[in-house]
């Protein structure tokens, strides 16, 4: 049987690293088994779903190389949900309810005060036909699924054996009074119709899974296998939000995080395997195993992405960055030498721009007061550009002879005068790239 997985985000905001974890696991399972990966946009919320978020989700996944085989939109399947709802009504598994949110809240509080679980009391099943007709006229009804009050069990791919007593769960609301089909129902219909065989999602969906198993069975379908990964928290243990901009994929991309660095961290975070940098999707897939992930909440610190990004960037061949370097205005003759000099001194590729500005426009000299006279003497001995690989050695030898300085007292002030920095690439490699020197003799 072909493995079919899906990633089903709601386009109500930009996706963050928590969403990515779900997407990556489902993508990896499909790709590793030669199966099908579906991107399904769960956009039945007409008020909050936006095309800009749908576009952003697809752009983020494309940036990461998480390609999909099929694109589905729930908004295109409303007729199918209506058909499935009709089937369940005729089977006696859908029933109409009329309580207002306030009335439901009062019932819930009363049960809690009595020390009982806040489970819906199925009062709507006891209404007469006359009462239903009257209430339907007065306020309109919403629809619940009638759960079989028995234990729902499955072997979870991460959490192990799961058993939930359906009697401890309220019959889920599947269609609102305004006709909007809710996630629990639409997702169940889609997963059966689309032949989904394996679903990985967050541990906050475990109860949903129990009810959806019954919904799928009531439709005559075979529920897929499930695995529920732990939820990510922020570095301090705080909950992640889809609208928490600093952890959205958009923001991480803007900060220069490389796709493979992000995927490498997410493919191992919360598992029994150590985090390591993968340079290709194939390397990542070879070591991926959903069974290695644990149930405990997992802390995500965005700062962990930058050592991985630095490692990834510094290992890139010139051919991978040639176009970016040329776009900075680096002459072809200097492009490859520039990369050799700059690559070990950048954290993200965006840092290349700063280095080329330094080389092409000159750096603001950093001159300590006690070195001012020394720098004036030294700069008087520096010829005009262009410079060659031998320039640094010849110049520092001349300065040493003229001033008597040597060692760090010679080299550090000269470096700071030319580059504005106390540390950096070898100056013998820097000199051929310098187009301008702003320090004066």
From Swiss-Prot:
It is found in: Cytoplasm. It catalyses: tRNA(Glu) + L-glutamate + ATP = L-glutamyl-tRNA(Glu) + AMP + diphosphate. Signal peptide: none annotated. A motif ('HIGH' region) lies at residues 9-19. One of its GO terms (cellular component) is cytoplasm. ATP binds at residue 242. It comes from the Bacteria. Its EC number is 6.1.1.17. GO terms for molecular function: ATP binding; glutamate-tRNA ligase activity; tRNA binding. Keywords: Aminoacyl-tRNA synthetase, ATP-binding, Cytoplasm, Ligase, Nucleotide-binding, Protein biosynthesis. It holds the Pfam family tRNA-synt_1c. InterPro entries: aa-tRNA-synth_I_cd-bd, aa-tRNA-synth_I_codon-bd_sub2, aa-tRNA-synth_I_CS, aa_tRNA-synth_I_cd-bd_sf, Glu-tRNA-ligase_bac/mito, Glu/Gln-tRNA-synth, Glu/Gln-tRNA-synth_Ib_cat-dom, GluQ/Sye. It is an enzyme of class 6 (ligase). GO terms for biological process: glutamyl-tRNA aminoacylation. A motif ('KMSKS' region) lies at residues 239-243. Its main location: cytoplasm. The keyword Nucleotide-binding applies. Catalyzes the attachment of glutamate to tRNA(Glu) in a two-step reaction: glutamate is first activated by ATP to form Glu-AMP and then transferred to the acceptor end of tRNA(Glu). HAMAP family: Glu_tRNA_synth_type1 (MF_00022). NCBIfam families: gltX_bact. Belongs to the class-I aminoacyl-tRNA synthetase family. Glutamate--tRNA ligase type 1 subfamily. Monomer. This is Glutamate--tRNA ligase 1. It comes from Cereibacter sphaeroides (strain ATCC 17025 / ATH 2.4.3) (Rhodobacter sphaeroides). The gene is gltX1.
């Amino acid at each position: 049987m072909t493995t079919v997985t899906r990633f089903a985000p709601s386009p109500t905001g930009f996706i963050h690293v928590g969403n990515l974890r779900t997407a990556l696991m489902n993508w990896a399972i499909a790709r590793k088994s030669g199966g099908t990966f579906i991107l399904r946009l769960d956009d039945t919320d007409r008020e909050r779903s936006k095309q800009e978020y749908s576009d952003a989700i697809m752009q983020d996944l494309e940036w990461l190389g998480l390609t999909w085989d099929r694109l589905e939109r729930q908004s295109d399947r409303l007729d199918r949900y209506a058909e499935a709802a009709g089937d369940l009504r005729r089977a006696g598994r859908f029933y109409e309810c009329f309580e207002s949110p306030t009335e439901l809240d009062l019932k819930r509080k009363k049960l809690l005060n009595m020390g009982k679980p806040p489970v819906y009391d199925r009062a709507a099943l006891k209404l007469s036909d006359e009462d239903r007709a009257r209430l339907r006229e007065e306020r309109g009804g919403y629809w619940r699924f009638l759960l079989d009050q028995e234990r729902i069990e499955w072997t979870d791919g991460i959490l192990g054996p799961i058993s939930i007593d359906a009697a401890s769960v309220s019959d889920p609301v599947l269609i609102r009074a305004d006709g909007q089909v809710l996630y629990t129902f639409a997702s169940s219909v889609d997963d059966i119709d689309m032949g989904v065989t394996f679903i990985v999602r967050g541990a906050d969906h475990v109860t949903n899974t129990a009810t959806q198993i019954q919904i799928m069975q009531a439709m005559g379908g075979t529920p897929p296998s499930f695995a529920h990964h732990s939820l990510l928290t922020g570095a301090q243990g705080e909950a992640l939000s889809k609208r928490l901009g600093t952890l959205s994929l958009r923001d991480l991309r803007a900060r220069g995080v490389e796709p493979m660095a992000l995927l490498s961290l997410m493919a191992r975070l919360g598992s029994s395997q150590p985090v390591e940098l993968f340079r290709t999707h194939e390397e990542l897939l070879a070591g991926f195993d959903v069974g290695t992930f644990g149930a405990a909440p997992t802390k995500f610190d965005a700062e962990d992405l930058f050592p991985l990004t630095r490692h990834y960037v510094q290992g890139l061949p010139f051919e991978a960055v040639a176009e970016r370097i040329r776009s900075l205005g680096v002459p072809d003759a200097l492009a490859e030498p520039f990369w050799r000099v700059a690559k070990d001194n950048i954290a993200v590729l965006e840092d290349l721009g700063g280095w080329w500005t330094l080389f092409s426009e000159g750096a603001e000299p950093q001159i300590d007061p006690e070195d001012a006279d020394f720098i004036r003497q030294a700069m008087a001995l520096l010829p005009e550009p262009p410079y060659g690989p031998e320039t640094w050695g010849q110049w520092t030898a001349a300065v040493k002879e003229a001033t008597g300085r040597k060692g760090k007292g010679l080299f550090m002030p000269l470096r700071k005068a030319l580059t504005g920095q106390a540390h950096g690439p070898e100056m013998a490699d820097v000199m051929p790239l310098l187009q301008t020197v702003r320090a004066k003799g």
